UniProtKB/Swiss-Prot annotation:
Catalytic activities: urea + 2 H2O + H(+) = hydrogencarbonate + 2 NH4(+)
Main location: cytoplasm
Lineage: Bacteria, Pseudomonadati, Pseudomonadota, Alphaproteobacteria, Hyphomicrobiales
NCBIfam families hit by this protein: PRK13241.1, urease_gam
GO molecular function, one term: urease activity
HAMAP family with a match to the protein in the record: Urease_gamma
Name of protein: Urease subunit gamma
Domain of life (superkingdom): Bacteria
Family: Belongs to the urease gamma subunit family.
Length: 100
């Protein structure tokens, strides 16, 4: 299987998000990389499903809550930017204050 660096990055984000979701299901609070991975994966998959940039910017801030994160993590993550592939091309999606 020959994957481009971009495809490897997407696969790594997806795997990290899967692990984070399993931990969350066990009641473990998310750390910084886990929270970013879940939100990033949500955006990438939403783009693949055909959702709009504006919709993902709004919905991306509703993926996880403060209660699901370790103390101080929401304050550490001010913006998340993800390059996602939409049906009409690649676009940058920015979610401001993603954990509310």
């Amino acid at each position: 299987m020959n994957l481009s660096p971009r495809e490897k990055d997407k696969l790594l984000i997806s795997l990290a998000a899967m692990v984070a979701r399993l931990r969350l299901a066990r009641g473990v609070k998310l750390n910084h990389p886990e929270a970013v991975a879940i939100i990033s994966d949500f955006i990438v998959e939403g783009a693949r499903d055909g959702r709009s940039v504006a919709e993902l910017m709004q919905a991306g801030a509703e993926v996880i809550t403060r209660a699901q994160c370790m103390d101080g993590i929401p304050e550490m993550i001010h913006d998340i930017q993800v390059e996602a592939t939409f049906p009409d091309g690649t676009k940058l999606v920015t979610v401001h204050e993603p954990i509310r």
